[in-house]
């Protein structure tokens, strides 16, 4: 345990940030999984809807500093390549 006052405060803020980031990452994984499953099932409308929602969440996570912009771009690209063949 830290003895310095500023470090004690820093530990508290780090823990809050860690929990917040964990929640955001968890919801991201869920959104991406929904889009992938809809694409695998061949449901064009649902896949498109979920892909759009996942892309939006990825962009928000980048703006909050939870993930890197290249990681978000990579995930969005992978989702798009799964959904695109369904559209025809």
Swiss-Prot record:
<dbReference type="GO" id="GO:0015935">
    <property type="term" value="C:small ribosomal subunit"/>
</dbReference>
<comment type="function">
    <text>Binds directly to 16S ribosomal RNA.</text>
</comment>
<dbReference type="GO" id="GO:0003735">
    <property type="term" value="F:structural constituent of ribosome"/>
</dbReference>
<feature type="region of interest" description="Disordered">
    <location>
        <begin position="1"/>
        <end position="28"/>
    </location>
</feature>
<dbReference type="InterPro" id="IPR002583">
    <property type="entry name" value="Ribosomal_bS20"/>
</dbReference>
<dbReference type="Pfam" id="PF01649">
    <property type="entry name" value="Ribosomal_S20p"/>
</dbReference>
<dbReference type="GO" id="GO:0070181">
    <property type="term" value="F:small ribosomal subunit rRNA binding"/>
</dbReference>
<dbReference type="GO" id="GO:0005829">
    <property type="term" value="C:cytosol"/>
</dbReference>
<comment type="similarity">
    <text>Belongs to the bacterial ribosomal protein bS20 family.</text>
</comment>
<keyword id="KW-0699">rRNA-binding</keyword>
<protein>
    <recommendedName>
        <fullName>Small ribosomal subunit protein bS20</fullName>
    </recommendedName>
</protein>
<keyword id="KW-0694">RNA-binding</keyword>
<keyword id="KW-0689">Ribosomal protein</keyword>
<dbReference type="InterPro" id="IPR036510">
    <property type="entry name" value="Ribosomal_bS20_sf"/>
</dbReference>
<dbReference type="GO" id="GO:0006412">
    <property type="term" value="P:translation"/>
</dbReference>
<keyword id="KW-0687">Ribonucleoprotein</keyword>
